[in-house]
């Protein structure tokens, strides 16, 4: 406990950066590193420290150091589910490099590093004649984020294929393998906490035909191009409530095309928010708040956001009515959803019910 009840002093970030750089063999350490540039919104401030982790040994070293120092840790994946406050993130952001992106296929079993990109992995599995991961071609995130939030779309999700995940624990400093049951994957949720870092996973797919799986991927890509916008966005902003679609509810509440400052609700899909180049995270958050308010006023339904909100004042977020993932304010910045329920067409429909 600090003397006289004073809060602990802020870390000396440049000094910590030098200390980490001396301990790590193949990782880059940067002070005041822009996080917004690493997200698909392209808005937001800096992390006090960013470590681009280059080896498994460095990751273990960081986990041990973090367990002692009690850092506030943020893991940044592909940035496709991340909104960073304009004031930035008061902690250490981690980004796994391509050293954690390797994937290998043995029979119908696929082992992949946490930094592997889902669309790339989905296409590779289809080319190998394996089925079960085709839906992931439309989820622009990494494997690590997919596990943390049970990514899904088109009637399937990670729970359907995952067998285990190796997890580094930045609270204890250790690492161990979690079985599927331990991960407790639900609709866009899991048992993983902010101090857990996915390192590697194994998925069990099924034998299929290359032509069949590649045609499925072509149909999913075409469907998404018709029904979802491009631009600077993070995909689905809100999770679908049971039996309904967040996009339908937002549209019914008159939110399509709604704009606050530099952020606007897509005119293509009302569950997507797009940020202008050079815009602000506060505008995006204000627009999210307004959409949620209008939906609740119109339908009585309280939407749960899917976006990882980082660096915002947590009490203020709760005052705004956000009742989202446990990682509000310091979560895992990786894509977690491709939309489901009535939000997207199921695999059976895409295949003409040939399954």
Predicted features by range, described:
Residues 2-143, 147:
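Anion-binding (especially nucleotide phosphate/pyrophosphate-binding) glycine-rich loop
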Residues 4, 340-342, 349, 354:
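Low-complexity, intrinsically disordered or signal/transmembrane-proximal segments
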Residues 6, 318, 335, 351-353:
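Basic polycationic patches enriched in arginine
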Residues 44-45, 49-56, 83-101, 148-180, ...:
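Structural signature of FAD isoalloxazine-binding scaffolds in flavoprotein oxidoreductases
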Residues 81-82, 122-125, 133-137, 147-157, ...:
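A generic local secondary-structure boundary/capping motif
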């Amino acid at each position: 406990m600090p003397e006289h009840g004073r809060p602990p002093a802020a870390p000396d970030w440049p000094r910590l950066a030098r200390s980490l750089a001396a301990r790590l063999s193949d990782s880059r350490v940067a002070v005041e590193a822009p996080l917004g540039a690493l997200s698909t919104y392209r808005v937001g401030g800096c992390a006090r420290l960013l470590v681009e982790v280059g080896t498994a040994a460095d990751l273990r070293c960081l986990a041990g150091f973090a367990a002692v120092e009690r850092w506030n840790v943020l893991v940044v994946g592909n940035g496709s589910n991340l909104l960073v406050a304009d004031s930035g993130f008061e902690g250490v952001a981690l980004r796994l490099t391509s050293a954690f992106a390797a994937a290998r296929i043995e029979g119908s079993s696929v082992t992949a590093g946490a930094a592997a990109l889902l669309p790339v992995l989905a296409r590779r599995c289809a080319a190998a004649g394996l089925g079960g991961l085709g839906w992931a071609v439309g989820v622009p995130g990494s494997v690590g984020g997919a596990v943390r939030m049970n990514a899904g779309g088109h009637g399937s999700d990670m729970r359907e294929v995952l067998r285990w995940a190796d997890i580094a624990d930045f609270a204890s400093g250790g690492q161990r393998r979690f079985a599927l049951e331990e991960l407790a994957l639900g609709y866009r949720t899991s048992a993983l906490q902010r101090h857990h870092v996915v390192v590697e996973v194994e998925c069990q797919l099924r034998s299929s035909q290359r032509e069949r799986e590649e045609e499925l991927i072509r149909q999913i890509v075409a469907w998404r191009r018709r029904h979802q916008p491009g631009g600077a966005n993070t995909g689905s902003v809100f999770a679908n409530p049971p039996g309904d679609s967040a996009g339908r509810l937002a549209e019914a509440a008159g939110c399509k095309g709604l704009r606050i400052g530099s952020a606007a609700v897509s005119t293509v899909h009302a569950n997507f928010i797009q940020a202008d180049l050079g815009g602000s995270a506060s505008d995006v958050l204000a627009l999210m708040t307004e959409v949620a308010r209008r939906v609740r006023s119109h339908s009585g339904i309280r939407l749960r956001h899917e976006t990882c909100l980082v660096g915002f004042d947590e009490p203020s977020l709760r005052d705004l009515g956000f009742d989202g993932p446990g990682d509000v304010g310091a979560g895992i910045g990786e894509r977690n959803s491709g939309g489901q329920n009535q939000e997207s067409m199921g695999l059976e429909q895409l295949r003409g019910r040939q399954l």
